[in-house]
């Protein structure tokens, strides 16, 4: 490990601190949150032990070789906190104490977080002394706060809807920054009941959606339309163009439904409405799916009710997003495509493919990166054919800011916050 790194509370980063964090991962896993679930079994599959070599070196021992371990070590399940930061249950005993350029000095849930530049940071120091990150759920309120000068910029997922970004750019004092995002958007089908237990019906829906139009009309062309389950920021991503064939889709629907019409429920999470044009997107799907003999009823549910409906199978289609945990898609493929995958079960996808299970078992012991890529290519191809979930597009990380600040750009997940400073 890097020498002379300190936590925000003054403790030294060393092998003991890392081992304390891994012990905490084991103790609390699986630990759910509104963000990502902390689960060491999915983040570090097959991990047997964490061994101290010396003060600044440690060893991870696995059941099988892990050629993509470095990808896993930069995922959301791998933060390293001060070993004094946990109580006996593994929960935080105060504000998180990391090693980054900013220290969290104050936090009011659902209101704001106050960041302060950490003087003991080992790298280039943050340009701003203090940054207050406010929570403003409503996009119109965020835009109004930005235009009034109440805030200098917006950040995070769906920070500014593309339509509002277009409006904002009419004012020369504001700027937009956009880049690829690790977030993908899907239409989850309930594969445990008719009609979406039939892959032909899932294919019909997929071919009926004009993804290019969706991206252009509702997202102003910032995202990238795709039929690939895997996000395009992964080094294993395979480019797969959307297949828009409405007439073929109608034929498949007739094969499944005959002459009957089917009433279905499309559920939409309220948190998506705060970030994306999900209402308009749901209404678009409601319109186009009529031609597949599907009468869509839109149900808007809060986060808890949305998750419950999916787990109980009380839905037919669901608007959903998924982030890419890390560059190696093993965990993502396992969660969604494995017959015992956690997302497969909790979203009632009802997907099972013996070849997929075989490939996922095979990749666990595959050392060659070329062979690993071949396996992932096949998994992407199978997913595009079977559609356990229906991919729509890879999102774009889109942020907006007042030109009174500089050094503020979008990254694939977040912003260049340490570089932010006043322009004058």
Where are these regions (language model features)?
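Bilobed periplasmic-binding protein-like "clamshell/Venus-flytrap" ligand-binding domains
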Residues: 67-73, 255-273, 318-322, 366-401
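Aromatic- and charge-enriched surface segment that lines or borders ligand/interaction sites
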Residues: 1-31, 195
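Short, solvent-exposed loop/beta-turn-alpha elements that line the ligand-binding surface or hinge
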Residues: 27-36, 75-107, 120-127, 165-181, ...
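Periplasmic binding protein-like
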Residues: 10, 290-340, 375
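Extracellular/periplasmic solute-recognition and catalytic clefts
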Residues: 105-116, 132-195, 216
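Append "and occasionally in soluble cytosolic enzymes with long acidic Gly/Pro-rich linkers
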Residues: 197-287, 297, 378
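Surface-exposed binding/hinge segments that line
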Residues: 12, 38-84
């Amino acid at each position: 490990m890097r020498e002379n790194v300190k936590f925000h509370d003054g403790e030294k980063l060393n092998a003991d601190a890392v081992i304390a964090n891994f012990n905490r991962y084991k103790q609390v896993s699986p630990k759910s949150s509104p963000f990502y679930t902390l689960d060491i079994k999915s983040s570090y599959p097959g991990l047997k032990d964490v061994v101290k070599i010396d003060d600044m070196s440690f060893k991870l021992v696995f059941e099988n070789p892990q050629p993509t371990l470095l990808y896993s070590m930069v995922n959301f399940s791998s933060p390293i906190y001060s070993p004094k930061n946990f109580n006996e249950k593994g929960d935080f005993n105060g504000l998180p104490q990391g090693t980054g350029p900013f220290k969290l000095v104050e936090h009011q849930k659902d209101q704001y977080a106050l960041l302060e530049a950490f003087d003991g940071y080992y790298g280039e120091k943050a340009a701003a002394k203090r940054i207050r990150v406010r929570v403003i759920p409503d996009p119109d309120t965020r835009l109004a706060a930005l235009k009034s000068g109440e805030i200098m910029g917006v950040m995070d997922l769906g920070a500014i809807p593309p339509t509002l970004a277009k409006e904002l750019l009419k004012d020369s004092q504001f700027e937009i920054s956009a880049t690829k995002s690790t977030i993908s958007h899907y239409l989850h089908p309930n594969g445990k009941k008719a009609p979406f237990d039939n892959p032909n019906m899932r294919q019909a829906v997929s071919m009926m959606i004009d993804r290019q139009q969706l991206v252009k009309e509702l997202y102003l062309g910032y995202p990238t339309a795709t039929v690939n389950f895997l996000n395009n920021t992964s080094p294993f991503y395979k480019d797969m163009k959307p297949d828009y064939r409405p007439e073929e889709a109608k034929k498949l629907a007739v094969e499944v439904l005959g002459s009957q019409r089917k009433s279905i429920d499309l559920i939409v999470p309220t948190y998506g409405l705060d970030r994306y044009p999900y209402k308009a997107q749901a209404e678009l799907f409601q319109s186009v799916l009529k031609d597949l003999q599907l009468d869509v009823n839109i149900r808007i549910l809060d986060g808890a009710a949305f998750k419950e409906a999916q787990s109980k199978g009380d839905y037919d289609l669901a608007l959903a997003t998924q982030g890419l945990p890390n560059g190696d898609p093993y965990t993502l493929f396992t969660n969604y495509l494995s017959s015992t995958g956690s997302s497969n079960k909790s979203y009632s996808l009802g997907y099972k493919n013996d070849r997929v299970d075989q490939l996922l078992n095979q990749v666990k012991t595959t050392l060659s990166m070329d062979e690993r890529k071949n396996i992932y290519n096949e998994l992407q191809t199978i997913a595009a054919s079977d559609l356990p979930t229906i991919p729509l597009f890879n999102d774009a990380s889109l942020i907006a800011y007042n030109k009174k600040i500089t050094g503020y750009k979008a990254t694939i997940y977040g912003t260049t916050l340490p570089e932010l400073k006043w322009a004058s």
